[in-house]
Amino acid sequence: MKKQPQKTLLAIALSVVSGTAMSHGYVSAVENGVAEARVTLCKFAASTGEKNTNCGAIQYEPQSVEGPDGFPASGPRDGKIASAESALANALDEQTADRWVKRPIQAGAQNFEWTFTANHVTKDWKYYITKPDWNPNQPLARASFDLTPFCVVDGGMVQPPKRVSHTCNVPEREGYQVILAVWDVGDTAASFYNVIDVKFDGDGPALPDWQQGGQIIPTMNLNVGDTVFTRVFDLAGENPAYTTELAIDSDALTVANNWSHALAVKINQTQSEIAAGQLNEQNQFVPVYGTNPIFLKSGSNLQRVEIGYKIETPAPEYDVTLSGLASEYQIGDAPVTLDLGLQATGDITTELTIYNHHKEPLAFETVAMTDGENKAVSMTLSKSEAGHHMLVTKVLDKDGTLQKQQTSDFMLTETQTPPPSDDYDFVFPDGLSSYTADTKVLASDGAIYQCKPFPYSGYCVQWTPTATQYQPGTGSHWQMAWDKL
C-alpha cells in the first residue's frame, strides 16, 4: 500500500479544520429580513428596542450555533434543536410562551435574511415551522415542527455573498410560532441552526391604537430599599407625570424577573396611555416574569419609555475584630507583652492604647489595614504593676474620622509561689458545691480566700464560667462572698 506524502495529509487536515472554523452566520434583519433569530436578538436589539436576555456566552457569538448535519433524520437531539447541541448556546433551549422576544410576521411571501461572518460553500437552506397545535411550553422537538420544510433554497455548492435574502411563502398560522432555519454547509458534516420566534398578527396590526415604545428588561437583581421606575418622554422631553415607580420592599421583589413583572402590573394599573406586557391571543397586555414590552397609545404624544433605577448604596462598614487578649497576665522578670490579632472590616486605621487603672498610657500602636486583612500586633507595657488595666481600641476610616471605639479590661497579677496545699481546701472552682462558711480556696491570683459566714456564704457557690461576679479576687463582687487571708 502506497503511503500518501505527509505534506498532502497536512493540507487535507488544514482544509477540513478551516472549513469548519470559517463558516459562520445567523438570521438577521439588517436590510429586508422579516425577523431576527432568537440568538441574533441576544446580541442585537430589534428595531423596537427589544432584546433577548440571559442568553449566556452565545450572545457574544451569534454566528456560532453550529451542530450535526442532517435534520430531521439526524442532527441535534430533541430538546437541543435551538442550541444545535452547542455548549455555548445551551440557554437557547429554554422554551416557554413568554421566554423570548417575538417578531411580527404574516403568512405569505416573506424575506429571510442571513448574515455571514465567514461565508462558505453551501448545499442548501431549509425553513421549517411549528405545527398549528404545538406546545410553546415544552422544549423544541421534532414533534413540534412540520418536518416538511415550507421553503428550500439550493446553495449550488458555491459561496454565497456575506448577506443573502430568501423569499419564502410562509404558511398560515396564528399567534406564537417558531421557524427553524437550517444552513447546510456544503463541504463539512455540520449545519447552522437558527430558531426564529414570530407572532402572526393577521392581515393588519392587532392593536392599531398602540405602538411599542420600550421594554422592561430584567437585567439585574436589586436590593430591598432600591426603586425601579419608568422614564417617559413626549415631544418636549421627559414628562414626570407619566412615571411609574416600584419600591423594592421585599426579598421576593429583589429577583429581576419578579420586579419586571410587578412593574408591568403597576403600569397597567396606574396608566391609561401606557401598557406593559406581552400581547396574548385576546389582544390583552399580560405582564410576564421576564422581558415586558411597553406600549404607548397612539395620539398621546408619548415617544418612548426608558427604565431608571434608584439604588440604595449602603453606608460603608468599619470595624475591627480583636483576638488574643487574655483576661489576666502574670508579671514576671520581663515586661508584660500582649500578643493580639486584628481583622479589618473596611479600609481602616486601628489605634490601640493600653492604660493602667490610673489612666496612664503604657503602650500604643497604630495599624493601617485593608478590608478583610489580618495582622498580628505585639504591645509591650512600659511598666508592669499588679491591678486593673484597659486596652482602648479606636477604628478610624481613611479620612481619619473615628468610626468606633471599644474598651477591653484585663488584669496584671504578681507571680506567687503557691501556698502549701494544707493551707486551703480546694483550688477554685474545684468542689464548688461543697463550699460552706470558712471554706478556704486557692484563687487564680495565687492568694487564699475564706468563704464568709452565713448569710454571705451562699454567694461562694454562685459561679459559672459566664457568671463570675463572686469569683474570689477577680469578680466584681467577690468581697461580698470572700475574705482574703
UniProtKB/Swiss-Prot annotation:
This is GlcNAc-binding protein A. GO terms for molecular function: chitin binding. Its main location: secreted. Probably interacts with GlcNAc residues. May promote attachment to both epithelial cell surfaces and chitin. Pfam families: GbpA_2, GbpA_D3, LPMO_10. Keywords: Chitin-binding, Secreted, Signal. It comes from the Bacteria. Residues 437-478 form the Chitin-binding type-3 domain. Residues 30-200 form the Chitin-binding type-4 domain. Residues 1-29 form the signal peptide. Belongs to the GbpA family. One of its GO terms (cellular component) is extracellular region. It is found in: Secreted. CDD domains: LPMO_AA10. InterPro entries: Cellulose/chitin-bd_N, GbpA_2, GbpA_D3, GlcNAc-bd_A, GlcNAc_Chitin_IntDeg, Ig_E-set. It comes from Vibrio vulnificus (strain CMCP6).
